[in-house]
């Protein structure tokens, strides 16, 4: 048996370089590179291996460990989970910084390989710099915190353990039903220790991503439900995107006259102009989808997790006879809501079910309802995009601090409303541009208002809704699709939380366009707070008032364009729609990353449409407005499913 003496880290690099995936007969390299921020716990181990021979892996220099891991997640997502960039860090704080990104990847079922350094396996120098010591268990390190947020976790305490650890890591990373974050913890001494690794460990491995078909019994059980239903609705989830099942879903829906509601993850799997596509569904959904969903007697969930935002906390479907049918690779997700399930690939299952329903001559009983719902939403879209600031202006959101809007207007001299800005942006940028989002009020506006005609052009992280994802993910999406314009759309709150990978985008000459909506606060949480009877507390960006000792002083102005200019970006400030349009046009011409600081009036985002969100309200309060909000919530909850 032939073997080669190598360090653990050298063997890891060689192994990663030989991983491939095959999908629908197309073979592709799986691991394209490694993000890293070197520290003492990784630089002389894995760092030495990469310096000696990176093979065909590209090394990227991150600026923040969470940021680089978000970029890697977005790279994998934009590649439909068939390409990854691994992430390595030092021990302690560097590793801990990646925990949030690990959770983000796992919630969204996106493959993310994390390689954090760890304290010494021998324990000889304990406590090493940045090591946590727990008196009840010396085996615990910072890296144990990855366990709850990863789909696979391992620690390589001996060089020979690397083999089983990495084979299992690849098993999970390439499994569409189980994928998510994988953490392989690398003690810093073990990284440099050597072993006679067998050559067969380094052979080219092609991980086949297959299209399993549900068993026949499941199909016929679901068929018997569907054929007796008159008003079904399909929920298009992220599984449709990753299965590349958009065409199959469109044909299925149009053949049987079944309307489609999109989740955040499923959006852009099919065209917005598709006659059956009603658009976003649920809490952040639009009027068309939610009105149709309310009366549906059957919900067909395709590749969806049925999150609370999709089901409006299980209150959206009000027909007492409603039943649920699912197509999902994951039996766990397929079984939710007491669904009759088909456990398998979305495309294969849709095509097989299509043939079965065709034999039954099935057609839904909808007449003009689908078309009328789409027309009504088009009219609402026109209204939203044409909302302008004028005398006696009343913003969309009614629950608010009355003074905030005029104070912000006076401070910035802006007249831009959030919905009109989004309408203009959609009009100005190319159809095949990729937009990236994650948090705040913008995902709701985008799910409702953004129309997609180009496949996979809508990149939204709304499983973990992680503030700070947007810019790093914009960079990751650009790495995945360098020929397209990428726009990271985010609020000032999210920008302030994390924007470090802007520097990496400049370093790599990968242009990202940042559309920063500045309304001087955490706008959507302020809406949630005040709409439930609570006061305006710590959700606007205000100075501490020396007289009241509270955060109710004046608004804090920030010149985001000026700050970003210092990083080397081409920047703009927009205070009216003409300035915004000119900035968008000029930004397209630039070769370097850009930032448009869009000053948007508070409370001018969209509101909900026929939906409710279950949040944990106070049962008792001295404020009658809070008590009233709780009573209303309790009333709605009575009509929602219990599980």
From Swiss-Prot:
Keywords in alphabetical order: Hydrolase, Magnesium, Metal-binding, NAD, Thiamine pyrophosphate
Gene that encodes the chain: iolD
One Gene Ontology term, aspect cellular component: acetolactate synthase complex
InterPro entries listed in its UniProt record: DHS-like_NAD/FAD-binding_dom, Myo_inos_IolD, THcHDO_hydrolase_firmi, THDP-binding, Thiamin_PyroP_enz_cen_dom, Thiamin_PyroP_enz_TPP-bd_dom, TPP-bd_CS, TPP_enz
Record note on cofactor: Binds 1 Mg(2+) ion per subunit. Binds 1 thiamine pyrophosphate per subunit.
Entry protein name: 3D-(3,5/4)-trihydroxycyclohexane-1,2-dione hydrolase
Physiological role: Involved in the cleavage of the C1-C2 bond of 3D-(3,5/4)-trihydroxycyclohexane-1,2-dione (THcHDO) to yield 5-deoxy-glucuronate (5DG).
Gene3D superfamilies: 3.40.50.970, TPP-binding domain
Residues involved in thiamine diphosphate binding: 65
């Amino acid at each position: 048996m032939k073997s080669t003496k190598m360090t653990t880290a050298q063997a890891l690099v060689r192994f990663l370089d030989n991983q491939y995936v095959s999908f629908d007969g197309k073979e592709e390299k799986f691991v394209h590179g490694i993000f890293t921020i070197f520290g003492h716990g990784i630089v002389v181990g894995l760092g030495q291996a990469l310096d000696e021979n990176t093979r065909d892996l590209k090394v990227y220099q991150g600026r923040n460990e969470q940021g680089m891991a978000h970029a890697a997640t977005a790279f994998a997502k934009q590649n439909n989970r068939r390409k990854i960039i691994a992430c390595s860090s030092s021990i302690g704080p560097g590793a801990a910084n990646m925990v949030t990104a690990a959770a983000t990847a796992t919630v969204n079922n996106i493959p993310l390989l994390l390689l954090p350094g760890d304290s010494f396996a021998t324990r000889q120098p304990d406590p090493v710099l940045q090591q946590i010591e727990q008196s009840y268990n010396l085996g615990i390190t910072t890296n144990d915190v990855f366990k709850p947020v990863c789909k696979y976790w391992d620690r390589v305490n001996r060089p020979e353990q690397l083999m089983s650890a990495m084979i299992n890591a690849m098993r999970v990373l390439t499994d569409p039903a189980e994928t998510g974050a994988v953490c392989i913890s690398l003690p810093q001494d073990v990284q440099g220790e050597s072993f006679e690794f067998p050559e067969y460990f380094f052979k080219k491995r092609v991980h086949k991503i297959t299209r399993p078909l549900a068993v026949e019994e499941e199909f016929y059980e679901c068929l018997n439900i569907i054929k007796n239903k008159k008003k079904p609705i399909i929920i298009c989830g992220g599984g449709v995107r990753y299965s590349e099942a958009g065409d199959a879903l469109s044909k299925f829906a149009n053949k049987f006259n079944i309307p489609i509601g999109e989740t955040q993850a499923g959006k852009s799997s099919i065209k917005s102009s598709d006659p059956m596509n009603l658009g976003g569904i649920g809490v952040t959904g639009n009027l068309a989808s939610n009105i149709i969903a309310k009366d549906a007697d059957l919900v067909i969930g395709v590749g969806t997790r049925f999150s609370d935002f999709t089901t409006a906390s299980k209150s959206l479907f009000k027909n007492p006879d409603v039943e649920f049918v699912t197509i999902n690779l994951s039996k766990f997700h397929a079984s939710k809501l007491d669904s009759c399930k088909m456990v398998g690939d979305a495309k294969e299952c849709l095509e097989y079910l299509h043939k079965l329903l065709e034999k039954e001559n099935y057609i839904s009983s909808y007449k003009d309802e689908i078309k009328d719902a789409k027309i009504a939403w088009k009219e609402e879209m026109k209204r939203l995009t044409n909302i302008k600031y004028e005398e006696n202006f009343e913003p969309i959101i009614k629950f608010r601090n009355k003074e905030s809007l005029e104070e912000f207007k006076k401070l910035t001299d802006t007249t831009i409303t959030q919905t009109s800005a989004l309408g203009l942006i959609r009009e100005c940028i190319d159809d095949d541009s990729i937009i990236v989002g994650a948090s705040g009020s913008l995902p709701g506006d985008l799910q409702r208002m953004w129309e997609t005609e180009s496949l996979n052009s809508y990149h939204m992280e709304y499983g973990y809704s992680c503030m700070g994802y947007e810019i790093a993910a914009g960079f990751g999406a650009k790495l995945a699709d360098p020929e397209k314009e990428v726009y990271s759309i985010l609020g000032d709150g999210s920008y302030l939380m994390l924007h470090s990978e802007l520097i990496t985008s400049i370093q790599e000459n990968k242009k990202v366009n940042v559309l920063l909506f500045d309304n001087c606060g955490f706008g959507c949480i302020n809406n949630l707070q005040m709409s439930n009877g609570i006061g305006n507390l710590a959700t606007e960006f205000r100075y501490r008032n020396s007289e009241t000792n509270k955060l109710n002083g004046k608004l804090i102005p920030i010149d985001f364009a000026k700050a970003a200019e210092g990083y080397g970006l081409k920047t703009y400030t927009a205070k009216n729609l003409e300035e915004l349009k000119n900035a968008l046009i000029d930004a397209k011409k630039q070769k370097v990353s850009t930032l448009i600081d869009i000053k948007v009036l508070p409370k001018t985002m969209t509101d909900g449409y026929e939906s409710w969100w279950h949040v944990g309200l106070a049962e008792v309060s001295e404020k009658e407005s809070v008590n009233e909000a709780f009573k209303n919530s309790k009333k709605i909850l009575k009509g929602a499913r219990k599980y």
